From Swiss-Prot:
Enzyme class per UniProt: hydrolase
Keyword set, alphabetical order: Amino-acid biosynthesis, Hydrolase, Methionine biosynthesis
Record SUPFAM superfamilies: Purine and uridine phosphorylases
Role played: Catalyzes the irreversible cleavage of the glycosidic bond in both 5'-methylthioadenosine (MTA) and S-adenosylhomocysteine (SAH/AdoHcy) to adenine and the corresponding thioribose, 5'-methylthioribose and S-ribosylhomocysteine, respectively. Also cleaves 5'-deoxyadenosine, a toxic by-product of radical S-adenosylmethionine (SAM) enzymes, into 5-deoxyribose and adenine.
Disulfide bonds: none
Entry GO MF terms: adenosylhomocysteine nucleosidase activity; methylthioadenosine nucleosidase activity
Catalytic residues in the record: 11, 196
Source species: Staphylococcus haemolyticus (strain JCSC1435)
Name recorded for this polypeptide: 5'-methylthioadenosine/S-adenosylhomocysteine nucleosidase
Cellular component, GO annotation: cytosol
Protein backbone atom coordinates (compact mmCIF):
# COMPACT_ATOMS: atom_id res chain seq x y z
CA UNK A 1 0.00 0.00 0.00
CA UNK A 2 1.28 3.44 -1.00
CA UNK A 3 -0.04 6.58 0.68
CA UNK A 4 -0.48 9.74 -1.39
CA UNK A 5 -1.25 13.10 0.22
CA UNK A 6 -2.13 16.41 -1.42
CA UNK A 7 -3.37 19.54 0.32
CA UNK A 8 -5.88 20.91 -2.20
CA UNK A 9 -8.61 19.40 -4.34
CA UNK A 10 -6.74 20.39 -7.51
CA UNK A 11 -3.66 18.53 -6.26
CA UNK A 12 -5.43 15.19 -5.81
CA UNK A 13 -8.30 15.27 -8.34
CA UNK A 14 -6.26 14.00 -11.30
CA UNK A 15 -4.97 11.00 -9.36
CA UNK A 16 -8.39 10.32 -7.86
CA UNK A 17 -9.96 10.17 -11.33
CA UNK A 18 -7.43 7.53 -12.37
CA UNK A 19 -8.05 5.18 -9.43
CA UNK A 20 -9.69 1.86 -10.21
CA UNK A 21 -11.64 -0.33 -7.75
CA UNK A 22 -11.99 2.78 -5.60
CA UNK A 23 -13.59 2.84 -2.16
CA UNK A 24 -14.17 6.02 -0.17
CA UNK A 25 -13.54 5.84 3.58
CA UNK A 26 -14.09 8.71 6.02
CA UNK A 27 -12.14 8.99 9.26
CA UNK A 28 -12.89 12.02 11.44
CA UNK A 29 -13.13 14.90 8.93
CA UNK A 30 -10.81 13.31 6.37
CA UNK A 31 -11.84 11.34 3.28
CA UNK A 32 -9.56 8.59 1.99
CA UNK A 33 -9.78 7.06 -1.47
CA UNK A 34 -8.47 3.52 -1.61
CA UNK A 35 -7.94 1.81 -4.96
CA UNK A 36 -5.38 0.91 -7.59
CA UNK A 37 -3.16 3.21 -9.60
CA UNK A 38 -1.03 1.58 -12.29
CA UNK A 39 -1.97 -1.77 -10.72
CA UNK A 40 -0.52 -0.72 -7.36
CA UNK A 41 -2.58 -0.52 -4.15
CA UNK A 42 -2.78 3.11 -3.07
CA UNK A 43 -4.69 5.29 -0.64
CA UNK A 44 -5.15 8.95 -1.53
CA UNK A 45 -6.27 11.84 0.64
CA UNK A 46 -6.75 15.60 0.50
CA UNK A 47 -5.29 16.83 3.78
CA UNK A 48 -6.31 20.45 3.67
CA UNK A 49 -3.89 23.37 3.77
CA UNK A 50 -1.32 23.90 6.51
CA UNK A 51 0.88 21.98 8.89
CA UNK A 52 -1.72 20.78 11.39
CA UNK A 53 -4.08 19.49 8.71
CA UNK A 54 -1.16 17.74 7.03
CA UNK A 55 0.01 16.10 10.26
CA UNK A 56 -3.50 14.92 11.16
CA UNK A 57 -4.10 13.37 7.75
CA UNK A 58 -0.67 11.73 7.72
CA UNK A 59 -1.25 10.22 11.15
CA UNK A 60 -4.64 8.88 10.08
CA UNK A 61 -3.37 7.41 6.82
CA UNK A 62 -0.54 5.64 8.66
CA UNK A 63 -2.69 4.33 11.50
CA UNK A 64 -5.65 3.30 9.35
CA UNK A 65 -3.93 1.93 6.22
CA UNK A 66 -0.34 1.11 7.24
CA UNK A 67 1.29 2.28 3.98
CA UNK A 68 4.84 1.17 3.21
CA UNK A 69 5.68 4.71 2.08
CA UNK A 70 4.09 8.13 1.63
CA UNK A 71 4.28 10.48 -1.35
CA UNK A 72 3.34 14.13 -0.85
CA UNK A 73 2.25 15.76 -4.09
CA UNK A 74 1.31 19.32 -4.93
CA UNK A 75 2.57 22.80 -5.76
CA UNK A 76 5.18 25.14 -4.32
CA UNK A 77 6.64 28.60 -4.69
CA UNK A 78 10.15 28.81 -6.12
CA UNK A 79 12.93 30.26 -3.97
CA UNK A 80 15.83 29.25 -6.19
CA UNK A 81 16.39 31.43 -9.24
CA UNK A 82 17.05 28.37 -11.40
CA UNK A 83 13.40 27.30 -11.04
CA UNK A 84 10.59 28.53 -13.27
CA UNK A 85 6.83 28.07 -13.14
CA UNK A 86 6.07 24.52 -14.26
CA UNK A 87 9.38 23.03 -13.13
CA UNK A 88 9.38 20.04 -10.78
CA UNK A 89 11.21 19.82 -7.47
CA UNK A 90 11.79 16.60 -5.55
CA UNK A 91 12.70 16.77 -1.87
CA UNK A 92 16.17 15.81 -0.80
CA UNK A 93 15.14 17.06 2.63
CA UNK A 94 12.50 19.33 4.15
CA UNK A 95 12.74 21.96 6.91
CA UNK A 96 10.37 24.31 8.76
CA UNK A 97 11.05 27.96 7.94
CA UNK A 98 8.73 29.31 10.66
CA UNK A 99 10.10 27.54 13.76
CA UNK A 100 12.43 29.34 16.16
CA UNK A 101 13.67 27.67 19.35
CA UNK A 102 17.15 29.16 19.07
CA UNK A 103 16.82 30.59 22.60
CA UNK A 104 17.25 27.01 23.84
CA UNK A 105 20.23 26.18 21.66
CA UNK A 106 18.38 24.69 18.71
CA UNK A 107 19.02 25.69 15.12
CA UNK A 108 16.60 27.96 13.32
CA UNK A 109 13.85 25.77 11.89
CA UNK A 110 14.42 22.93 14.34
CA UNK A 111 11.60 21.60 16.51
CA UNK A 112 13.02 20.76 19.97
CA UNK A 113 14.10 17.12 20.21
CA UNK A 114 13.60 16.67 16.45
CA UNK A 115 16.15 16.76 13.64
CA UNK A 116 16.54 20.05 11.79
CA UNK A 117 16.14 18.37 8.41
CA UNK A 118 13.81 15.49 7.62
CA UNK A 119 15.50 13.57 4.82
CA UNK A 120 13.66 11.79 2.02
CA UNK A 121 14.13 8.05 1.74
CA UNK A 122 17.23 7.34 -0.34
CA UNK A 123 15.72 4.40 -2.21
CA UNK A 124 12.73 6.53 -3.17
CA UNK A 125 15.09 9.25 -4.38
CA UNK A 126 16.88 6.72 -6.58
CA UNK A 127 13.54 5.63 -8.01
CA UNK A 128 12.58 9.23 -8.72
CA UNK A 129 15.92 9.88 -10.43
CA UNK A 130 15.25 6.86 -12.66
CA UNK A 131 11.83 8.26 -13.56
CA UNK A 132 13.21 11.76 -14.22
CA UNK A 133 15.90 10.44 -16.55
CA UNK A 134 13.57 8.07 -18.38
CA UNK A 135 10.74 10.56 -18.88
CA UNK A 136 12.94 13.66 -19.31
CA UNK A 137 11.04 15.61 -16.66
CA UNK A 138 12.31 19.13 -16.05
CA UNK A 139 12.96 18.33 -12.41
CA UNK A 140 15.53 19.06 -9.75
CA UNK A 141 16.25 17.56 -6.35
CA UNK A 142 16.74 19.88 -3.39
CA UNK A 143 15.53 21.29 -0.09
CA UNK A 144 11.91 22.33 0.41
CA UNK A 145 10.87 24.50 3.36
CA UNK A 146 7.43 24.69 4.97
CA UNK A 147 5.48 27.16 7.07
CA UNK A 148 1.94 28.30 7.77
CA UNK A 149 2.11 31.32 5.45
CA UNK A 150 1.62 31.77 1.73
CA UNK A 151 4.78 33.53 0.59
CA UNK A 152 3.56 36.33 -1.63
CA UNK A 153 6.10 39.14 -1.27
CA UNK A 154 9.71 39.70 -2.23
CA UNK A 155 10.61 40.57 1.38
CA UNK A 156 9.23 37.26 2.67
CA UNK A 157 11.04 35.37 -0.07
CA UNK A 158 14.38 37.07 0.61
CA UNK A 159 14.09 36.52 4.36
CA UNK A 160 13.52 32.79 3.95
CA UNK A 161 16.33 32.49 1.42
CA UNK A 162 18.71 34.37 3.72
CA UNK A 163 17.86 32.15 6.68
CA UNK A 164 17.76 28.92 4.66
CA UNK A 165 20.18 29.42 1.75
CA UNK A 166 19.84 25.82 0.53
CA UNK A 167 16.06 26.07 0.21
CA UNK A 168 14.81 25.78 -3.37
CA UNK A 169 11.04 26.02 -2.82
CA UNK A 170 8.49 26.89 -0.15
CA UNK A 171 5.03 25.51 0.67
CA UNK A 172 2.80 24.77 3.66
CA UNK A 173 2.62 21.01 4.41
CA UNK A 174 5.63 18.90 3.43
CA UNK A 175 7.70 19.18 6.61
CA UNK A 176 4.72 18.37 8.84
CA UNK A 177 4.11 15.26 6.74
CA UNK A 178 7.80 14.39 6.95
CA UNK A 179 7.93 14.87 10.73
CA UNK A 180 4.93 12.58 11.16
CA UNK A 181 6.54 9.97 8.90
CA UNK A 182 9.73 10.30 10.95
CA UNK A 183 7.83 9.61 14.16
CA UNK A 184 6.17 6.53 12.66
CA UNK A 185 9.29 5.32 10.79
CA UNK A 186 7.54 5.50 7.40
CA UNK A 187 9.63 6.43 4.31
CA UNK A 188 8.50 9.56 2.48
CA UNK A 189 9.23 11.73 -0.52
CA UNK A 190 7.82 15.05 -1.70
CA UNK A 191 7.08 15.97 -5.33
CA UNK A 192 6.16 19.59 -5.98
CA UNK A 193 5.55 21.54 -9.17
CA UNK A 194 6.35 25.25 -9.16
CA UNK A 195 3.14 27.30 -9.36
CA UNK A 196 4.61 30.71 -8.55
CA UNK A 197 7.89 32.49 -7.80
CA UNK A 198 7.04 33.47 -4.19
CA UNK A 199 7.11 37.17 -5.05
CA UNK A 200 4.74 40.12 -5.32
CA UNK A 201 2.79 38.41 -8.10
CA UNK A 202 2.66 35.00 -6.41
CA UNK A 203 -1.07 35.09 -5.69
CA UNK A 204 -1.92 35.76 -9.34
CA UNK A 205 0.56 33.18 -10.60
CA UNK A 206 -0.67 30.59 -8.11
CA UNK A 207 -4.28 30.94 -9.20
CA UNK A 208 -3.31 30.84 -12.87
CA UNK A 209 -0.87 27.95 -12.80
CA UNK A 210 -2.15 25.73 -9.97
CA UNK A 211 -3.92 23.45 -12.43
CA UNK A 212 -0.81 23.00 -14.55
CA UNK A 213 1.31 22.42 -11.45
CA UNK A 214 -1.13 19.75 -10.30
CA UNK A 215 -0.88 18.01 -13.68
CA UNK A 216 2.92 18.00 -13.53
CA UNK A 217 3.12 16.74 -9.96
CA UNK A 218 0.46 14.08 -10.57
CA UNK A 219 2.31 12.90 -13.67
CA UNK A 220 5.54 12.28 -11.81
CA UNK A 221 3.66 10.50 -9.01
CA UNK A 222 2.05 8.16 -11.55
CA UNK A 223 5.41 7.44 -13.15
CA UNK A 224 7.04 6.86 -9.77
CA UNK A 225 4.36 4.41 -8.66
CA UNK A 226 5.00 2.33 -11.78
CA UNK A 227 8.57 1.60 -10.67
CA UNK A 228 7.92 1.03 -6.96
Amino acid sequence: MIGIIGAMEEEVAILKDKLTDMNEISVAHVKFYRGKLNSKEVVLTQSGIGKVNAAISTTLIIEKFNPKLIINTGSAGALDESLSVGDMLISNDVVYHDVDATAFGYKLGQIPQMPLEFKSDQELLKSVETVINKKNYNAKIGQIVSGDSFIGSVDQRLTIKRQFPEAMAVEMEATAIAQTCHQFHVPFIVTRAVSDLANGKADISFEEFLGEAAKSSSSIVESLIKVL
